[in-house]
């Protein structure tokens, strides 16, 4: 009789020994701390963690996933039974932002109302205006981010203003000056082809009405096809991004000759050691038949060595360097960075130019707000001897 009872007592133990890999699966996700963000939108981003064995859950992976949104200042998660409990603290994402900047060759400021979490669904909306030393402009845009269960994302934008445009060579000599009124509007759709790959098409209208038609005024309908590959990762200090974007545009001119353009932009940010990362970026712009009023400056290739009033029909440039996060403070992360940059440009009204030199600056990434607030840098072009200094606070454009 005693042996019979012992047999029944040992059966559960034998069963557990036969299935040692038995584990709990995450079947439910609870989110705490949301204020503006709709829970359903955030749950979509966390779907990959559902039906995952509890012992396979990686808190750092979840933190990295949510840091990509740039909407949360605090993220915590723990598994309790079969429930994943996520606690977040949202950044301020709807704010009127006064901004100003001053550079050695320009100055400006204005006010923008930015919502980086429009309607609580992680869309982005902007409306505002600015003035500078020789122009004013108003603008508005809305960007609907593609969600997991939607077929595509879309964006719409419009802007208008007036400027006294001056085109200079790299030494700062004035080559051309004209007054012009501008208006632009665009609509585009985009689709995620893979977690790291997105395709987009867009079109619209661009009007540049030049006083006395010198150079020629332009009314252009652009059609753009773009492909962007990108990945992001959170290292505890910085949100690092690696990306490559290629776009081709055919510009139908209703008043003059049509023309085409190709643009490439790339960036690489990589964590090296604690609070230190490698930063590199570069670009290419090619549009040999571009009209004067549509020529681009060095911002097309993400370089800051030239005079901003220098316009080109083709250029290539880039830079590589390091950025160090000084400390994690209650307000955010101050950082210093240094790069060496180089550029070649086929200017529209003078000879080809090249330049290279160091760039050093300071940034402040705000903890409670979903955008950086301060960027100060100094650049020196070794080839021409040009110093450029820029200091900006608030919204960057």
Please place each PLM-identified region on the residue numbering.
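Bacterial N-terminal signal peptides that target proteins for export
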Residues: 1-10
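Short acidic/His/Gly/Ser-rich catalytic and metal-binding motifs that mark active-site loops
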Residues: 38-39, 164-167, 290-292
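C-terminal transmembrane beta-barrel domains of outer membrane proteins
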Residues: 46, 243-397
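N-terminal signal peptide c-region/cleavage motif recognized by signal peptidases
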Residues: 18-20
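Gram-negative/organellar outer-membrane beta-barrel architecture
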Residues: 87-234, 242-243, 264, 295-302, ...
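Soluble N-terminal domains of membrane-associated systems
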Residues: 12-13, 26
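Periplasmic polypeptide-binding modules associated with outer-membrane biogenesis and secretion
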Residues: 22-102, 112, 128-144, 205-209, ...
